[in-house]
Amino acid sequence: TCAVLQALVNRSLSVAAAKCDPDYIDPMFHSRIIGAKSSNLDPFFFDENTLRFLLAQNASGCDVTVIEGVMGYYDGLGLTSTRASTYELAQKTVSPVVLVVNARGAALSVLASVRGFLDFLPDDRICGVILNGCTAMTYAPLARVLEDRLGVKACGFLPNLPDCALKSRHLGLVTAAEV
C-alpha cells in the first residue's frame, strides 16, 4: 500500500489513505508516506452511511483515495463470512478494487487465482490487478494475458525488494516511527 501511495505522490497527485479495520499502525505508515492523515474504515463498527461519510470526509480535496484492505479480499469474521471484510467495505462504499496478487514464481497460475476472485461472489468490484513479486520481464506478458483473457486491467507490479522489507517484532507490528 505504501508503495502505491508513494507512486501516486510521485505523479503529483493529492492522495488520501484509509485502512479497512481498526488497526492504527497501517494508517501511521500511510500518513508518513503521503504527509496527511489516514483514517480507518471498519465495516464491523460503522454502518454504510457512516463509512461513506468518513470516506468522503477523508477524501475531501484529494485526487484519489487508496483504501488498504484487511487479510484476504473476502476474509471476514469467523472464517466463513465476508462480514467486516474488504469485499464488504468495497460494496458499502461503492469503491473500485485493485487486487494485489502474489505472482512470485508463477505464470498462468496467477490468472487462475485472479479468475477465482472474479468468479467467487457477484459484484466483486475488482477492476484491476497488481502483480506482487514478479519481474519486469514476466510482468509484460502476464499483463497482456490478464487483460486479454480476464478483461481486468493490469495496473503494475511490485518486484521482490529484500532491502525494503520491514523487520517485525511482537506480532509483526512495527510503527512508522521505528522505520
Positions of PLM-derived features:
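ATP-dependent carboxylate-amine ligase catalytic core
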Residues: 5-93, 101-125, 136-141
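Conserved beta-strand segments of the P-loop GTPase G domain that flank and frequently precede/overlap
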Residues: 99-102, 130-132
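Short hydrophobic alpha-helical runs that function as membrane-insertion/retention elements
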Residues: 97-100, 155-156
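Internal gly/pro-rich beta-alpha loop/helix module
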Residues: 108-179
